[in-house]
Amino acid sequence: MKKTKIVSTLGPASTDVDIIAQLIEAGANVFRFNFSHGDHEEHLDRMNKVHEAEKKTGKTVGIMLDTKGAEIRTTVQKGGKLEFHTGDTFRISMDDSIEGTPEKIAVTYPGLYDDVHEGGHVLFDDGLLDTVIDEKDDANKELVVTAQNDGLLGSRKGVNAPGVSINLPGITEKDSDDIRFGLDHEIDFIAASFVRKPQDVLDIRELLEEKHMEHVQIFPKIESQEGINNFDEIIKVSDGLMIARGDMGVEIPAENVPLVQKTLIRKCNAIGKPVIAATQMLDSMQENPRPTRAEASDVANAVFDGTDATMLSGESANGDYPVEAVSTMARIDVKAENAFPEFGTPRPQFMTNDVTESIGDSVTRVAKELGIKTIVAATKSGYTARMISKYHPDADILAITFDERTRRGLMINWGVTPIVVDEPESTDAIFDLASKKAVESGLAKEGDLILITGGMPVGESGTTNLMKVQLIGSKLVQGQGVGDKTVIGKAVIADNAADANSKVTEGSILVTKTTDKEYMPAIEKASALVVENGGLTSHAAVVGISMGLPVIVGAENATDKISDGELITIDSHRGIVYHGASNAI
């Protein structure tokens, strides 16, 4: 199964319930709603359609609200677009009531004049038009700039000043209104645009507290040099990270973006916080059914870097091939995951005093050593599953939680499949439930080993303190085991010695009520014994010890519960007989 999660942006190309359902089936785990576009009514309609698609597919997804953020844009241009040529000189006004002309344009942020300096650059429309500041006209509060390249400039286009600390607010009034709207409609994640300092995140967290929605996770979007410089402090107050490479690639030199991506992913991996690699990952698929080879490499390398999720923007929101974009990204993710041992960044070993995280590390190690394919984490808050995910185990992670909000919050974490169940009353109930749900989820089958982690008291956050290796199988009978071997073979049910001696063949497992010396011809050919009567001093037990033969004695009603010729597994260490071939240890 795919372990890397996919964040898919919804838009005009993905409004239909059937299309959204196809996106889910293709591999989308979280849907992003970009509040830079559209109104609340439009977004609510799409949210409702997502829930319809969930019912249609029987699968759960997360919902992410992406804020517009405090950004600088140009005002409306006279005639719609202005044309500039290299060497053209014009002015930038701070008066947002001015309509742009080839001689003077205006921006929406009056503080830009004070923030920038002569010799610095002002970029427009994602850097498509580059200008250098020649002069600051204090009298008119205008910047005199010279175009560094030919280009067209439209209305309401983005403005960037690379390397400059911009004194815009962390969140705008629109952002606050949008977030409150999202919280009223049960969003799971907030992608906070243009975060530059920790306070920007804390301002959003105040809104969560106001609505008693502290479970909603905040993912700051690092899009500037200032945000990069303050990252270590920003991530401390955040739940994860989105590496928004679009504006970042305008604010810092493009050649630095891959290095920043690797650094930020590594830092998030180290503290176990999920990270999303975003922007232009399969950009050409807005118009083409296949990605460029460079785009395929970009997605794969993000997986190799250790990202938890890869994201689609315009590809799924506005493109001609939204479903194909998701399915293509899913195939690339899986291919890269399979090659991770050879090409991926090794997971560093982290030192910690946190009990849950230590168990997460131990669970990953034990699963690898025993070849376990599924880890089941019983978790109230989701923290246990996140700490296991941090170590990127080869095994799938099935998170059993007791709250729908926790389930949705885990949709972004690498390798985690979350489900909701009724809260069990005891650890034994957790163990039984873990086996049942692992099979129902298709992550394990009879005969597989699973590794279960949970805590006591059951249902309390932060109590993860145990792990158990458990065999999934139909236990037929149990008694006292002699030896420590596991044997798989066909059962031979014998009523007496003559019956046993005539029916037992080399390697079969003798199942009988009792044994004595007359059973020896059969015992010498058998690979194991299951006997209803007797204890550790019985004939069967003594023979088993002397011959090194796995034996289970005191297996009540074994001759009735086990069928003649049935394939069974003898776990003499635990004294258990399982139906079928099981990987008991």
Question: Where do the language-model regions lie?
Answer:
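Structural preference for beta-strand elements that scaffold enzyme active sites
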Residues: 5-7, 30-32, 60-64, 89, ...
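Glycine-rich phosphate-binding active-site loops on the catalytic face of alpha/beta enzymes
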Residues: 10-12, 29-40, 189-194, 241-252, ...
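Conserved alpha/beta-domain cores
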Residues: 3, 8-12, 42, 164-279, ...
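Acidic, glycine-rich flexible loop/linker segments
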Residues: 70-172, 437, 443-498, 503, ...
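ATP-dependent carboxylate/acyl-activation modules
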Residues: 88-89, 265, 269, 276, ...
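Expand to "…catalyze enediolate/carbanion chemistry for C-C bond making/breaking, isomerization
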Residues: 1-12, 16-17, 24, 39-42, ...
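Conserved, mostly hydrophobic/aromatic
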Residues: 9, 34, 66, 119, ...
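Glycine-enriched alpha-helix->loop->beta-strand junction motifs that scaffold or abut catalytic
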Residues: 25-30, 184-188, 208-212, 236-241, ...
